[in-house]
Amino acid sequence: MYKYGTVVDPAMTTNRRSRLSGFRCASTARVTATLLLSFLAFSPSSASSDFGDRFHDDIVLPPGPVLPSAPEIPEPAEHTFSLRHIYHHGTHLHPSLHRKRDVVHEQSRVYLAAEDDFSEYDILRLKAKSRPEPIHRLADRRPSVVDPMVAESRQRGYAAVLDASAWTMDQVSSPDIKDKDTVLTLALMTANAYVEHDTDADWEDVGERWNRSADFGWESDGLRGHVFVDDTNSTIVIGLKGTTTAVFDGEGTTTNDKVNDNLFFSCCCAQQGQWTWHQVCDCATGTYSCNNTCVVQALREENRYYGAARELYSNVTELYPDAQVWLTGHSLGGAVTSMLGMTYGLPVVTFEAVPEALPASRLGLPVPPGASAEYPQMRENTGTFHFGHTADPVYIGTCNGATASCTYGGYAMESTCHAGYECVYDVVADKGWRVGIGTHRIRSVIDDVIKKYDGVPECKRTPECRDCAQWKMYESNGTETTTTSSPSTTSTTRTRTRTSTCETPGWWGCLDKTTPVTTTTSTTSSSTSTCKTPGWFGCKDKTTSESSTTTTTEASPTTTCETPGRFWGCRDEVEATTTAKPGQVTNVPVTAAPTGTTDDSLSTALPETQRCLARNWFGICKEWAIDDLEFATDEM
């Protein structure tokens, strides 16, 4: 490159330009920064804020954990289920027992057992539809996290209070309760839970090793659950065994079911009710006064069905960790599945379930912020649906009267409120049914209700329902078995002083000798004799005359009745008598004095008298005869 006759190296020129360019850029940046800071010092605060936002946007944060994205809303789908496993968990006699038996469809026959008028029903493959349902539940629902929380609530006596961040509102794949076939399928799964022997396959231990020498009778104690799985292993249904209704104890799980029923669904352990109720604790301290702390302690023992159901669910989820779980049950099994669903946030469909809001309030179940732990029926988005009809006294909460079948069997069913939604078939109005315990059976619900209706009923919540309104529930410190609670009242004691003591009391008074009593009245009377022969209603002595202004003296008759009547009256001949009244003079006939000689002509004729010839049935004379009385002077 030439400049004014001088040769210049192009590389040197390029380097110089680069240095000058870098110098100019650096100087310009410093000047611009100085002017910008001066401008911001005199600008409004909003400008400073905008600068701060731009400044933070330029900061590069270090890499952190990847936050989970919002779960996708499940699409409606159709599932085909088959029975895969049967679980059995001990409760009372064998609390550590937990066994499982697999069902092989090529070798096993799955059926509903015959019941009364219903024959056996084979179950091959069951179809059901699903739909998304919002459920407010814990974000971390693993049994290893939830179970210690529930155990702590059981020890403290109240539900755990969790932050709102621990809860989430999820769209969960749930049974389509508006589809009749889906409801029928779940009912069949519930009915199948009553079948105890499907195959002759051996049971395998799930929990600790079971002593084979004590193998006799274990099937009569515990909770039975049947597990249905769809073809893709993505959805499973657990059907829990309900109450085996019986009047007297002894067969199967009847005794244990009765104890759990009366713990769960009575106001105060079946006390102060009907004399046939099976009492299961002693927590009542007065008339309709109950120590709720005592009831809670009796209800939360781990050898009850609720604890067994949680452990059964834990083992099933270990076998299918990624599957969506549905719960179903009938009667007591339906109530237990509802409480299990509220614990882990699972979809639940029950049939003729006993109202379970009362025991749910005593178990210390986790509740979301803003919900009432005392009234679970007020919770929203629980994902629980209770199907039943109006002719079932257990479902509608009226099986507690003196003549009710539940009372006759020893069951105290006093609860009336369901948590979640109620789907009621009004068979009383639609079909003219009468309320009776016979309609409570699941086979009757399947064949006579669900299959007979063209659709399904509308499901509604009942948040205004209340249990045990007449009872006064109070809490104690839990150190005593029972506590007596009496309100402070002011009472007035009346004292009566007696001036005499009765030595011989009678039925209606005192039998002692009477004493003269003086009163302030103007008339004074006194008795001149005492009672020597007291009787039941008075004195048997002859009455004495009392002084008065008019004295009347009556002469006692000198004759007695020789011929009494059949029932009353006297049949003797009537003699004429004359009664002299005061102030009246009666002329008495006077006869001449007798002389020494006797003459028949001196006989005096007396007045005529009447004589009864015939009398009637009551002794009254019907026919009279008149006779002349004659007498001789020598008779005088």
Curated annotation (Swiss-Prot):
Glycosites: N211, N233, N291, N315, N477
PROSITE patterns: LIPASE_SER
GO terms under biological process: multivesicular body membrane disassembly; neutral lipid catabolic process; phosphatidylserine catabolic process; piecemeal microautophagy of the nucleus
Primary residence: membrane
Keyword Metal-binding: no
InterPro entries named among the record's database cross-references: AB_hydrolase_fold (IPR029058), ATG15_Lipase (IPR050805), Fungal_lipase-type (IPR002921)
Residue ranges, Lumenal side: 43-636
Molecular function as annotated in GO: phospholipase activity; triacylglycerol lipase activity
Segments of skewed composition (Low complexity): 479-500
Enzyme class: hydrolase
Region Disordered, residue ranges: 478-500
Substrates-to-products reaction catalysed: a triacylglycerol + H2O = a diacylglycerol + a fatty acid + H(+)
Gene Ontology CC: multivesicular body membrane; vacuolar lumen
Ranges that cross the membrane: 20-42
Record localization: Endosome, Multivesicular body membrane; Prevacuolar compartment membrane
Membrane topology of the entry: Single-pass type II membrane protein
Annotated knockout phenotype: Significantly decreases the radial growth of colonies under nutrient-rich conditions. Strongly reduces conidiation. Strongly reduces the production of deoxynivalenol (DON), an important virulence determinant.
Residue ranges, Cytoplasmic side: 1-19
Keywords: Autophagy, Endosome, Glycoprotein, Hydrolase, Lipid degradation, Lipid metabolism, Membrane, Signal-anchor, Transmembrane, Transmembrane helix
Its EC number(s): 3.1.1.3
Family: Belongs to the AB hydrolase superfamily. Lipase family.
Role summary: Lipase which is essential for lysis of subvacuolar cytoplasm to vacuole targeted bodies and intravacuolar autophagic bodies. Involved in the lysis of intravacuolar multivesicular body (MVB) vesicles. The intravacuolar membrane disintegration by ATG15 is critical to life span extension. Autophagy is required for proper vegetative growth, asexual/sexual reproduction, and full virulence. Autophagy is particularly involved in the biosynthesis of deoxynivalenol (DON), an important virulence determinant.
Subunit structure: Binds to both phosphatidylinositol (PI) and phosphatidylinositol 3,5-bisphosphate (PIP2).
The name this protein goes by in its record: Putative lipase ATG15
Originating organism: Gibberella zeae (strain ATCC MYA-4620 / CBS 123657 / FGSC 9075 / NRRL 31084 / PH-1)
Classification of source organism: Eukaryota, Fungi, Dikarya, Ascomycota, Pezizomycotina
